[in-house]
C-alpha cells in the first residue's frame, strides 16, 4: 500500500499532523504502537489539557531557552490564535487562565482527544494501532516503513511524531531518534526537563518540609559564584526528594545544564517567598504586624504570610521562639526572618531521571 503521508505516533503532534495532511488532500496513514491514540494528551495539564497560550508570539518565544527563534517560521503558518480557532471551529470552547494558559471549558482533556479522533475519521485518515515500526528505509522519492512480519508500507512523506523518552507509560521510548539520525538529522544529548529537582539537604532527607506548598514564589538557580542563572515565578511543592511544582519544573533544565557546564555536584536555588516586596519593606511589615498585636505570639501574627509548618521551620532556623511577642522581639531577628523569606536557599544535586520528566530536552538539533 502506498500513501502520500505516513505519520508515526498517535500523540498530540501525530494527531494534528495526520489531520492536517488529510485535510489538505493527502492519503494519510497514522501508525501507533500502543492500543490507544492521544494517551499523553489525555493526561496533559493534570488531565485538563493546556491546549495553548494566548501570550504574544515574541513573549512566548522569549520564554523558550536556547534557539526559540526557530518557532517564528512555524508561527507564521500556524500560531496560537490558529490553534484556538481550530478547536473552537470543531466545537471545543476554550477559556483563559493564569499566565495566558488556555484550557477547554469542560476542564477535561478527553474533550480535546475525542474531538481530534472524530476529526481523523471525518478526514478519512487510516489508523493502525498496536503496530510497532521496525525500520524506515529512506529513498529519493518514496520511503518504506517496515512493520512486523516484514510488511512494507510505502509513502512519499513520513512524519516522525513519536515523542522523546519522557513519560514512557504513554509509549514514548525514544524510538524516533535513530530514524531521524538515519534521515540526516543531528541528534544532541538528551536530558530531562519539566522535572522535579532533587536535594540531599537534611531537611529534605528527613522530610521536614514534605508536602508544604508555597504559592506564587520566585525560585532562582544560582551559579557557583552566586550570580543568578534564571528565575521562574509560580508555585512550589517540597517533596521527600527535593522540590517540585510548576516553578521548579520550569527551572529544572537550567539546573541540569548548569551542573554540567560548571562541572559541579550541587547548585544552590534560592526561593523568594515575597517577590513583589523589597526586603526592607518586608521587615517593616513584619514589625508592623507584631506591633499591632503586641500580646500575640509572632507565630500567630505572621501566620498569614507562610504555611504554618514552613513558618515554624524558618523561626527554628534563626533560633527565634514561635511564642515570642512584640515586647520581646529583637529587631535583628526580624531582619534575619525577612532574609530567610527572601533568600531561602536549597542545595540541589540534579533532577529525577528522564523517565520521570514531562519533557525530553535535546534530541533533533534545530541549528
Per-range role (PLM):
Residues 1-13:
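Beta1/beta-strand and adjacent pyrophosphate-binding region of the FAD-binding site
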Residues 48-96:
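Glycine-rich active-site loop/strand segments that organize a redox cofactor
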Residues 129-130, 135, 312-367:
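A glycine-rich dinucleotide-binding beta-alpha-beta segment and adjacent secondary-structure elements
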